[in-house]
Amino acid sequence: MANETKKVAPARFAYDGLDRIIHEKARLGILTSLIAHPKGLRFNDLKQLCALTDGNLSRHLEVLEEAGLVAIAKSFEKNRPKTVCKITPVGRKRYMQYLDVLEQVVRDAAAAAASAEPNPAQTKLRLA
């Protein structure tokens, strides 16, 4: 008897599109803030919007910049440092792809929850 191999369909609930770089809570907040402000945000404004410390924001921005998702422009204004962060076109595209997958997760979860809810008529029958 010959060994038959079946093609295995991709795992339905693998959600490979949930980009690990974006999925981290702080980085998701950063990208969401930046996508809502296409001209960019100053470091301190972004820090307040995301409720992060200087160090946390710096580290997460570094990860996002290395991945090509954000661009950081540093300059001086009246002898004070000015850092402006913007989402890149690549960052915008990956963020939107991430949202598509996240929306599928929500749809799947809602469908699973709805199918798991007991039918009120059946519950009454069992209780009687």
Language-model segments: residues:
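N-terminal helix-turn-helix DNA-binding core of bacterial DNA-binding proteins
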Residues: 13-56, 77-78, 84-86, 93
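Acidic/proline-rich low-complexity IDRs
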Residues: 17, 51, 56, 68, ...
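Residues within the DNA-recognition helix of helix-turn-helix
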Residues: 60
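Short, charged, low-hydrophobicity "junction" segments
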Residues: 1-5, 40-43
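Charged, amphipathic alpha-helical coiled-coil/dimerization segments
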Residues: 63-114
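Amphipathic alpha-helical dimerization/coiled-coil segments
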Residues: 2-9, 13, 32, 93-128
